[in-house]
Amino acid sequence: PEVFIYDHLPSDTRWQLLKKPVTSEDYAGFVRLRPAFFQTGLEIKSHRKGIIEIDDQVIVTLRAPDRAVLMAELLRDEDKLDESYTFIQRQNGSYNIHAITPRAGPYVLRVFSKNRHEEGSYAWALDYRIKAAKGGGGGFPKAFGTFSENGGYLHSPMHAKLKRGSTQVFKIQVPGAEKVAVIMGDNWHHLKKEGDMFIGNIEIQDKHIRVFAKFPGQEQYDGLLVYTGS
């Protein structure tokens, strides 16, 4: 019932089968879901309303089965913005969809989904209308496919641009990885392994900052994330 109420509002509240019936006013404000949302087994977890008012950042959380994979984009005036303004990662049976706005104003956060082993492109699943009070001044780091394919989860740092001379706390969860290193030029800074978590305080010394991981049975490291020193 909690899923179907987004798609259809019974005129008789008894047929909603909900502990707290939804009013017509509530229903009018719900996020509008498209067929792909239901076809990939998604559920709303964090934001039921279709309009989200924020300062400059938001995290939308959707429950999703293991078979579902997501993409997201941020639009302004129907124009797609740079992919660095969204960042998706999976944890505990849900996807966290991070979005940051470059400046104040209205935006659309659009989410696409597909079943993992299905051929074809991602399908439009839902839209949120975002009202931002200000801009966040930069996007998220670039994530390689290896990051999501191995269940990676980035705790920090979340901003793509890191100030040179600053010390940043790198905290990255990479299930199954043997080693994770932050690479700047020829310098490799290996993070401390604590279970699936890799943690370390790293001084930013270069313009090009990459995070790589080594997995069992591999001699070479695979790329996970890319940052920029500014």
What function would you assign to each model-found segment?
Residues 9-14, 18-26, 133-153:
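Surface-exposed beta-loop interaction hotspot
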Residues 84-97, 188-200:
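Aromatic sugar-binding surface patches on proteins
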Residues 99-102, 200-204:
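Short, flexible loop/turn segments at beta-strand junctions in immunoglobulin-like
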Residues 115-148, 216-230:
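Short beta-strand elements
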Residues 139-180:
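Compositionally biased low-complexity segments at domain edges in trafficked proteins
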